[in-house]
Amino acid sequence: GIKKWVIFALNEESVLGGVRATEQLHIPAADVIGVGINGAGEAFAEFQKKEQTGFFGTIAVSSTNHGKESAANLVEWIKTGKQPPADTQTTGKLMVRGNWQEVRKELGI
């Protein structure tokens, strides 16, 4: 049988659904690594639990930075006619139980 589980999704809610399912199946948290993307309240609540769960972390992104970059691209497009690239990628930072408060502060979330 499967001994180690990886749960990945594009948000914390989906990952937490998988984590809760492993808990119901009595799979130890040490055998589960759940990672989401966003860096929102669901992750913060999980990090504050007394016992570590299978929710390992999230890739935190700053919606403020997304908005600033999008607005700057739009203004440049309007002013100069320079169309933004079709694929604009952003960066994120791994937020885990041990650094979540520092990452929140760093990213302004």
Regions found by a protein language model. Give the residues of each.
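Hydrophobic alpha-helical
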Residues: 1-46
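Structured segments of extracytoplasmic/periplasmic soluble domains
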Residues: 21-28, 46, 50, 73-81, ...
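A structural signal for short secondary-structure junctions
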Residues: 28-29, 53, 88
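Short, conserved active-site loop motifs that form the nucleotide-linked donor/cofactor pocket
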Residues: 32, 55-57, 92
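Short, charged, surface-exposed secondary-structure boundary motifs
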Residues: 43-47, 67-70
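Short beta-strand elements at the ligand-binding edges of bilobed clamshell
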Residues: 49-64
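Hinge/cleft segment of the Venus flytrap/periplasmic-binding protein
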Residues: 61-109
